[in-house]
């Protein structure tokens, strides 16, 4: 995503083939399907609202699970504003904090850090001005202590000094749900910086699609993220123009 975005391309942070399109149940999860179909019906993609339910990750991915549905729970919270203005806007940029940390620190593969340092895949300093940082945790369900370390690395890079706000994906299976909230507020240490939590993207189910590089408005009152520009265009119309 970061490499393609640096080249000026809009990329889409969302469903993948194995976990979503090839869902072991009888159909794709309805919420995920709605936003996936936004690639063919743009109206579906322009406004992101909370899912009414959430699903647990599967424990069994064998052939025995084909045709079985995921364990489903009622969503009780919706998008949660942890602090800051109820309405904020900016250009989406971000990713999985586990991966961003590895890319910047080289803790997993040393050459990742070399590549990031050389090409500046993760923007630095003022290049975050006007951006909304989106973050989520992976299926590894890192501890709150580990999340604090990773967030502090972003803080040390000065990212929180420039962004317009943060949106945070629902933790998979709601593991460390409340603990993560406390860590975000503790590390950011700026009550004026908006943090919207429990948004349906990332490694939790179901999930929407976030287009990197697109300007959006986040509205806690209306419980929505509104895309302010189209992430797709009609190729025929574009070429004729």
Task: Tell where the protein language model's regions lie, with residue ranges.
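Conserved anion/nucleotide-ligand pocket segment
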Residues: 9-98
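Structural motif
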Residues: 9-12, 90-91, 131-133, 164-167, ...
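C-terminal active-site/capping subdomain that shapes the small-molecule cofactor and substrate pocket
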Residues: 137, 141-240
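Structured loop/turn residues at beta-strand edges in well-structured enzyme cores
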Residues: 7, 128, 158-161
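Short Gly/Thr/Asp-enriched flexible loops that form oxyanion-binding sites at enzyme active sites
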Residues: 1-4, 179-181
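Oxyanion-binding "anion nests"
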Residues: 92-144
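Peripheral docking tails and interdomain loops at the edges
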Residues: 3-44, 51, 190, 199-241
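Alpha-helical scaffold segments in soluble metabolic enzymes
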Residues: 2, 35, 99-103
